[in-house]
Regions:
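Active-site glycine/GP-rich loop and adjacent strand/helix microenvironment
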Residues: 1-124
Length: 124
């Protein structure tokens, strides 16, 4: 998501607070997915994303893409989606995240100078 340079960038907590206030709701749920994949990860209220059983996330080390980051350490997000049976089932994103628990991750942002990606042209 994000503003894609069209508005002032804001952190997720700030955006979620504005949405909760505007729509008079207690929590915001989120989806993490991309065009190249058939599956998505979902976050219910707390910003921790969980994947379905056929989709796996890997947090790679910043300095060594062949090494995994430790739990609660940030790194680049890789996704394996076994639902992609006739296309590439794994991608390396330029998103930064951390594995919080064995089956959940948090998105922290994007790598500096990474290409602007996504279809979300969020506006208020």
């Amino acid at each position: 998501g994000g503003m894609k340079g069209r508005r002032k960038e804001m952190v997720r907590q700030e955006l979620h607070q504005q949405l909760k206030t505007a729509f008079n709701v207690d929590a915001i749920h989120s989806e993490y997915g991309m065009t190249e994949l058939l599956s998505q990860a979902y976050s219910k209220k707390n910003g921790l994303f969980k994947t379905p059983p056929w989709m796996k996330f890997i947090i790679r080390d910043f300095e060594d893409p062949y090494s995994l980051a430790k739990i609660n350490s940030s790194g680049g997000i890789n996704i394996i989606d076994l639902a992609n049976i006739y296309s590439c089932s794994f991608i390396e994103t330029q998103d930064i995240g951390k594995e919080v628990e064995k089956d959940s991750f948090e998105i922290l942002g994007r790598f500096d100078k990474s290409e602007v990606r996504g279809c979300n042209l969020l506006s208020f």
